[in-house]
Amino acid sequence: MGSQSSKAPRGDVTAEEAAGASPAKANGQENGHVKSNGDLSPKGEGESPPVNGTDEAAGATGDAIEPAPPSQGAEAKGEVPPKETPKKKKKFSFKKPFKLSGLSFKRNRKEGGGDSSASSPTEEEQEQGEIGACSDEGTAQEGKAAATPESQEPQAKGAEASAASEEEAGPQATEPSTPSGPESGPTPASAEQNE
């Protein structure tokens, strides 16, 4: 990197030469900015406030900010006044029942039990929980699908259908306890799932 003077054409005036021609303006500005080298005492004035502003003389002029009187009570401590109500969070409600690690989450109609809505997972957690529950059953294909993010939504729908078919086929479950995959033979549960 060369200096400015070597790159500038000979007819032009460089920044260094322009600064040398007019060293400082009368009001202390240089290139449109106030020049501050630590010497802020203006000429002709007798007393000036200190740079950091902690002098007692500056407080006597009335420019200093005074603390609030203690008569305001709770507002002086930074607490919210009782008249203002904070915004209420929207309660999350489920549209479809689902099972997550053995727990059944169903929609409660107009019940005051806010415990289930406060600790309930979000929709993504629902889908992941359904996929996780299906992979716990032992199907290898659904376990692979849980690893790929593109197929999470179709598997979640499949998991809902399989959960619903298992509930309907519960009394009719005379087949062995091995879980049936979507590609298995024609069983009542898989027939309902394909529909």
From Swiss-Prot:
Enumerate the UniProt keywords alphabetically.
Actin-binding, Calmodulin-binding, Cell membrane, Cytoplasm, Cytoskeleton, Lipoprotein, Membrane, Myristate, Phosphoprotein
First-listed, main subcellular location of the protein, grouped into a coarse class: cytoplasm
Subcellular localization: Cytoplasm, Cytoskeleton; Cell membrane
Which portions of the chain have biased composition (kind: Low complexity)? 16-26, 53-64, 153-195
- A Gene Ontology biological process annotation? actin filament organization
List the PROSITE patterns. Answer: MARCKS_1, MARCKS_2
What family does the database annotate? Belongs to the MARCKS family.
Tell me the function of this protein.
Controls cell movement by regulating actin cytoskeleton homeostasis and filopodium and lamellipodium formation. When unphosphorylated, induces cell migration. When phosphorylated by MAPK8, induces actin bundles formation and stabilization, thereby reducing actin plasticity, hence restricting cell movement, including neuronal migration. May be involved in coupling the protein kinase C and calmodulin signal transduction systems.
Q: What is this protein called?
A: MARCKS-related protein
* Originating species: Homo sapiens
